[in-house]
Amino acid sequence: MKNAKKKNGAAAKGKGRATLSAQQTIPYLSMHPDGVCKLPGGLYTKTVEYEDINYSVASTEDQTAIFSGWSSFLNYFDSSLPFQLSFINRRSHSRSRYQVNIPKADDNYNSVRDEFTGMLKNQIAKSNNGIERSKYITFGIPAEGIAEARPRLERVEADVMGNFKRLGVPSEPMDGRARLALLHSQMHPRNREAFRFSWKDIPQTGLGTKDFIAPDSLDFRQSRTFRIGQYWGAVSYLQIMASELSDKLLAEILELDAEMTVTMHIQTVDQLKAIKTVSYTHLTLPTI
């Protein structure tokens, strides 16, 4: 089915460096039906998809409340619970992604409602330039095995979704198939084909989950760019060390008319350690 990908592999050739297959380049170890993913180093993760917060169009008072609530949400994660925020912009092949709900009524105007709904969907699609913007939070814990990790992750997941609910933000946990579908879409840019996968395919075919999501090839030989199949991409790294940041920074990046993925890897630092780090940085800063 996709065994040919193992032959093409990830072109990562160099001196004394073996070529990896496309599957071997994908760094997770196993994906479970309930959405628990095992990573190297005994780390287990889960992902929750959430919708946008209407921050930019809110009043100043509401923005303050939203910011305060979001800060409390982030403070839920202590130093033992690393997490990642992912913002993915993709070209839309269908306008059904945009949800506009005008309920039907028992009168003669449902045709007008349908027409108005279609018009709103078209306007939303045009305003986004055909870009679908999705948001995810992934959190992980170290554990000896899946039996230990699963109940702990489920508790964190329930807390995260409860915090989103208090913010008025709809959220939904991602099961294993949904996470695989997301990875598949990331590794097959602009692919219009639906993701075809069922857990019963694993024992029937003898393939692993990576065989269903891996691209034909991954090429990382260039220092600044990489290639997935026939598409080229680039990665930029930004380390944020500023004491203050504009609340528009992320929004302005995500509003670019481009397919891209922005990830924020966040590790809460113990308060005492943070104070020591800030004090040391202050002492070592050069004077002018």
Annotated model-derived regions:
Residues 1-286:
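Extended, folded cores of ATP/NTP-driven motor/assembly subunits in large transport
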